[in-house]
């Protein structure tokens, strides 16, 4: 089909959970635009809400490190998962993450130019690794969180090595409570963040473009209901409030008990400790967010559908 390929149909199905023919039709209607096709499927109730880039594939590792009241997450990409399991690559990610703790802010270019523990710069070591391992690699991004008093708690979901894996989380808790109180709380919150994929700390932090996209989808659904315009407006506002509640960390329902808002979990922990605990910030890095991986082999049924 003009405008899209079998790979696009396959990717849309992965992104949306829609059936093959529904995915094909959506791509036809949107001229092959994947994001628009997802929105079209959702407006028709044929696709589940997908977290931003949650299914995009790329290889490599996310590293996390903490020193004092500062924590950092770093993503380093490779072409294959085989390299991600390589001891040399893992050592590079681990040491580069440690170097990132010395960088002010989230300047990945400054990280690349920084001194590497074994000599030269981070980029020099990366170039050497590419030559010896025989595969392209890239230091992609970094994110730092700090507290003036309290703890930053690191967590890696399904770690392949200490502090290395495909999902890395940092939780920044501001408080005068002891580490014995804060660290277990931070670990539970980090596990929640890894599972629940919040888009921002609170509703005010949600990306305006993301909200506008959800508003457009909600408006299309409301219009299809055939209800009066004033009712449609209430439906749209209700949908946006629900989206914000489900995607802002502080209003999300804690996955550990499936009933308590994260803000209330933190509040209760502070009361139990006889002090105030503030969830100041967090980082959630999932390997490959926003990176498209080239497809080289497609299911026969997808190819047949596109040709059909």
Curated annotation (Swiss-Prot):
Gene3D superfamilies: 1.10.286.20, DNA helicase RuvA subunit, C-terminal domain (1.10.8.10), Elongation factor Ts, dimerisation domain (3.30.479.20). The keyword Nucleotidyltransferase does not apply. Residues 80-83 are annotated as: Involved in Mg(2+) ion dislocation from EF-Tu. It is found in: Cytoplasm. CDD domains: UBA_EF-Ts (cd14275). One of its GO terms (molecular function) is translation elongation factor activity. Keywords: Cytoplasm, Elongation factor, Protein biosynthesis. The keyword Protein biosynthesis applies. One of its GO terms (cellular component) is cytoplasm. It comes from the Bacteria. Associates with the EF-Tu.GDP complex and induces the exchange of GDP to GTP. It remains bound to the aminoacyl-tRNA.EF-Tu.GTP complex up to the GTP hydrolysis stage on the ribosome. PANTHER family: ELONGATION FACTOR TS, ELONGATION FACTOR TS, MITOCHONDRIAL. This is Elongation factor Ts. It comes from Erythrobacter litoralis (strain HTCC2594). The lineage of its organism: Bacteria, Pseudomonadati, Pseudomonadota, Alphaproteobacteria, Sphingomonadales.
């Amino acid at each position: 089909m003009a405008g899209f390929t079998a790979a696009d149909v396959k990717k849309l199905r992965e992104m949306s959970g829609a059936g093959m023919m529904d995915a094909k039709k959506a791509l036809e209607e949107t001229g092959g635009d994947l994001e628009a096709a997802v929105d079209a499927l959702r407006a028709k109730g044929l696709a589940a809400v997908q977290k931003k880039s949650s299914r995009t594939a790329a290889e490599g590792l996310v590293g996390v490190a903490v020193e004092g009241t500062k924590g950092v997450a770093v993503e380093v990409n490779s072409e294959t998962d085989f390299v991600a399991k390589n001891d040399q690559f893992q050592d590079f990610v681990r040491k580069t993450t440690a170097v990132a703790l010395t960088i002010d802010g989230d300047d990945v270019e400054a990280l690349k130019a920084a001194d590497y523990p074994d000599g030269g710069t981070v980029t020099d070591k990366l170039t050497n690794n590419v030559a010896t391992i025989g595969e392209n690699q890239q230091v992609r991004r970094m994110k730092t969180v700090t507290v003036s008093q309290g703890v930053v708690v690191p967590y890696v979901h399904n770690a392949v090595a200490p502090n290395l894996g495909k999902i890395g989380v940092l939780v920044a808790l501001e408080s005068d409570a002891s580490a014995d109180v804060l660290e277990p709380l931070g670990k539970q919150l980090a596990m929640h963040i890894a599972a629940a994929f919040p888009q921002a700390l609170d509703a005010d932090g949600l990306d305006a473009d993301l909200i506008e996209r959800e508003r457009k989808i909600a408006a299309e659904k409301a219009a299809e209901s055939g209800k009066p315009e004033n009712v449609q407006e209430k439906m749209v506002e209700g949908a946006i409030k629900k989206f914000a509640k489900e995607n802002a960390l502080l209003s999300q329902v804690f996955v550990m008990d499936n009933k308590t808002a994260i803000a209330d979990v933190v509040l209760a922990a502070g009361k139990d400790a006889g002090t105030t605990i503030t969830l100041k910030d967090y980082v959630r890095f999932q390997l490959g967010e926003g990176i498209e991986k080239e497809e080289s082999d497609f299911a026969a049924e997808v190819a047949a559908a596109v040709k059909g």
